[in-house]
Structure formats: structure tokens, C-alpha cells
């Protein structure tokens, strides 16, 4: 279907000569694939060598679209196959499913309590990067998404003839415009564009898949280990390097890191606001028919005290009222975030009517869920609110945690300049590794500040210092959960880690005296011989 419509679009837009050329190349390629004929391959190469540049461009464009459509068709076929297997298997779990894995573990002697203990210590963090292999524009990806939806409707819906024709017309429209759409951008995207692109690419899928994944695990555990209480913690989260990986990329600065985190936060907050509004529409239980528990009553009362002029106090639907109050706090949090100007070294008093930590939102949602379950509303208590709780556990208030990465050489050069400028040490870079370790160990045990509040160093050194100060400011004023990992690339010695600890101490991220660290340092040993 897709190939036929694609061919018709080429025939209409580029003409019969172009269409025949593309079909000839396609058929010759298929023959080579089926026969592995070296002679046919040489004939094809000879044919391509004789084609003019403008026609080669047309060929490249045609086959680019063709392979995108072919990949889409293969994805649809795989989904169709999986759905068919699940329908035919009835109670039998699918191969490689969560349930199948748990059955295999049970049959090998693993007990439910062992699964419980494993889950409590599990921590799975898929990390997104701005991978150069995905250079397609958002416009192209949107067209493919639209085509996938159309194919789903043709496959799974019972359609009237007029509805089927409408879908076929929509497919033809998308492919016709796809053929004349630029597949890649004209200019290189900025870092913040890459952040936005990843959000646009994965956000819609993740917020649908994650709750389903949590439900699949819960269902499988209950079925495979009946009667055993196995708590499912938040063992899954997502990370990103985009906006945090500054190793070799001068465009990733402390300002870009701040902007990337803010964009991720704003995105997930807006999504939560939409979901809470939807939830309030579902939970329309009237107090004429139910009596809310004391914990919910107290929670509503506490929230009302945060909004003295609130006019929602007369609503006689307690769960909806609580959702409205959550909505207000989320919107206040979003406003606070948008107007926030980070200020390192200056104490900031956080507003009381915002969410700062994700557990605050989780507590509010759990109050509603627990009350629903205690009143016998098991479907509502285990329905949409449970999915939202799952999302908050996974994405918290930052969508993706951001890993900061910098090359070890940048830290060493910056520290050497600071030590010389402050009259502490003239020749830090000339010290051997053992001497550096001794010096840095002594420095970390001193209470004095090494770096003044006002920076007077080179641009590169100031950027290193500002990165750590930005991390500290974000943890204190914006989001305490988003930044936890600092990656040192090209690590070859232990002193590389101590250099980072010095900068972390100076920013307020680490202290030996007070026994705390707000970051986990991750050395990369790719430079070791």
C-alpha cells in the first residue's frame, strides 16, 4: 500500500521518466539481493555512474522516503504479529515478557521475597544522548507518526467505506508531501534545540509506556507469586547527557545546562497539570454519598491555608477539591520556575505554596488513592491516579536527570590558574601524581574558601567554577533531584577525582567537615592504556 502510493506520488510529481528510472534501480537491486550476482551488481554500478547529478539527487530522495516507509511497514508488521501471538496464547505469557521471565525465575527456585529484595536495590536509568544517527526533522517524524496512526485505524477499526477512503486520502496526502519535504535541517541545531527534539521525540511514548510497564510488572508478580507481598519501588528513571555533556563541546555552558533543566521541568510540570485536571474530572464523588477520611480532610485543610483567597472551598466533592488544590500548587511551581533567577551564595526562601520535591506531590496523590481504597473504590484507587503516581515516581519534577560531564584536563588547568592567582601554589601542573594527591587531600581538609565570590580568571576557568555553582544553585533553589552525577572523562589518576571535589566543596556541593556530598562522581577510564 505505502509503496504503491509512494510510486504514484513520484509519477505525478516527477514524471514517468523519473518513475521508470527509480523502478529500474529498485528492481535491479532486488535481483542482486536475491541472486548475489556480481555481474548484476557491476551492471547496476555502471548504470548509476552514467546518471546525471540532478537525477541522482532524485534517486536519493526517492529511496530515502521509500526506506522510511518500509521501516514503518516492518514496525507495523511486528506489532501485528505480537498482538496475534498474545490473542492466541490466551493465558500463556509471551516470550521475553515480564511474566515469562518471572515464571522462569520461579521454576529455577527463586522466591518472591528474593524478587522483592532485588527490586528494592534495582536502579535502571536509560540515558538519552543527541545521537547523530537521528538527523531527521521533527516534521518528518510527525509525518511518520501520522502514517502509523492511519495504518492502525485500517488494521484494527471497523470502518465505513467512506471512513476508509478518508484514511487512504490522508495517507496519500502525507506521502505526497513527504516526497517534497526536506529530510534534514539546513543548519546545525543548537544544544537547546537538541534538548527540545529529544522531548518531542520520546515524551509522548514514555508517558504512555511507563504506567503500562508498571502495571505489567504488578500483574505478573501477583500472578506468578500469588499471596506474596512484593513492593514495587521506583527502580526506573531516565537520564540525559544533552545540555550537560560539555566535554569537547564549547556550546554547552552553565547557562545552557540551566536552560536544559528548566525546559525539561516545564515540560513535565505542564503534563502533570493536564493529568491532574483530567483526574479531577473522574473523581467526582460527592460528599452526599461518601465521608472522606480524616487524613484527606486534614490534607485539604492544610492546602487551603496556603491559598487564603481561594474560592473553591464550597466544592462538595472532596477528591476533586484536592485535585484542584494540587493543580494550584503545580501551577504556582511552574510560575516560580519560569521567573526564577538562580543566585549562587544567596539564601533563597522558597514559597510555601509550591512543590519543590517530588515526594510532596506523591504524598498528595497517595492521600487521595489511599482514601479511595479505604472507602471501597478499588477501581478508582487503582486507576488513573495510580498511573499518575507511577509517572511521578519515574519522572519526578525533572523528566530526565542530567549528567554533567567534563574532561579531566579542564579541571586541572582551571585549578592551576586559581592556585597561582590566589598565591597558594605556583606550579600545580608540574607536580607528579603523588604530590598532587597529597596537596589536594590537605586542601580538602581545610575550612577556608579557596575561590572568591567574584571571579577574576580566564573565561575557561570561570566556566568550570560557574558550572559547579550552577549545580549548587539548582539543587538549593530549583530542583534537588535533577543533578546527582558528575562524569570525569579521560580519568587516569585518583587526583582527577580530588580536583573535582575541590570545585564541589567551593560551590557547596561537598564537605568533609559536615559529612555530605550532593553529587556522585563517575570517572571514565577511556584514556587508560
Where are these regions (language model features)?
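Often metal-dependent polyanion-binding catalytic scaffolds in large enzymes
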Residues: 1-442, 460-463, 484
